[in-house]
């Protein structure tokens, strides 16, 4: 079993969400710190992004923020994050999220979080990105998205093998188990995309 050293987390910047999502984020952050895993994330100081960073910093873990310059200029960046990478734009930011990570983890979020997740799934489908993609379906948040993905397979817009692109889990403390249970993926995936 490969040791997980670095993960990227996609998550929300919204502050107006149910406290249960913040609690799930804290639990996941603590598991990652306990296992000495570096976290790469969007660099924000608000919403789940802020709670993720605050928890990792409080627990003495390592977190890296990646953010376009224009977002720093309006003070969205978390000033206490260990390391920051500032990019020219959102496209470069998404590329940097995937550099050197052992897995991608998606927490509840809005259109930005879902867009990042779906792009990662597309890149995996094409064999460009081959690491585990796990979705924290806390409190059934992603039920409708998962049903839509399954429906796209049923309707032959994707193949049955594409259901192995992602793995869902509901308990934030089971994140490492979800990563390790993910189906290995090949760069040859383009052949059956």
Residue positions per predicted region:
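Alpha-helix capping at helix-to-loop junctions
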Residues: 113, 123-129, 151-158, 181
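A cross-family phosphate/adenosyl-ligand binding-site feature
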Residues: 2-100, 139-173, 177, 183-193
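Short beta->alpha connector loops at strand-helix junctions that form conserved
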Residues: 43, 67, 87-88, 107-109, ...
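Short glycine-/polar-rich loops that comprise or flank the Walker A/P-loop
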Residues: 129-131, 164
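Active-site/ligand-binding-proximal alpha/beta "capping" segment
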Residues: 92-127, 134, 184-193
């Amino acid at each position: 079993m490969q040791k997980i050293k670095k993960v990227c987390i996609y998550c929300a910047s919204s502050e107006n969400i149910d406290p249960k999502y913040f609690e799930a984020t804290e639990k996941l952050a603590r598991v990652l710190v306990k296992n000495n895993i570096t976290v790469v994330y969007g660099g924000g100081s608000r919403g789940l992004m802020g709670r993720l960073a605050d928890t990792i910093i409080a627990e003495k873990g390592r977190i890296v923020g990646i953010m376009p310059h224009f977002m720093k200029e309006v003070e969205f960046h978390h000033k206490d994050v260990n390391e920051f990478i500032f990019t020219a734009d959102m496209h470069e930011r998404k590329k940097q999220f995937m550099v050197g990570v052992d897995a991608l983890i998606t927490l509840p979020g809005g259109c930005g979080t879902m867009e990042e997740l779906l792009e990662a799934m597309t890149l995996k489908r094409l064999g460009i990105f081959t690491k585990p993609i796990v979705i924290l379906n806390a409190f059934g948040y992603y039920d409708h998205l998962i049903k839509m993905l399954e429906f796209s397979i049923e309707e032959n817009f994707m193949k049955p093998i594409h259901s192995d692109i992602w793995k869902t889990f509901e308990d934030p403390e089971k994140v490492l188990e979800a990563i390790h249970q993910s189906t290995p993926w090949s760069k040859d995936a383009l052949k059956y995309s």
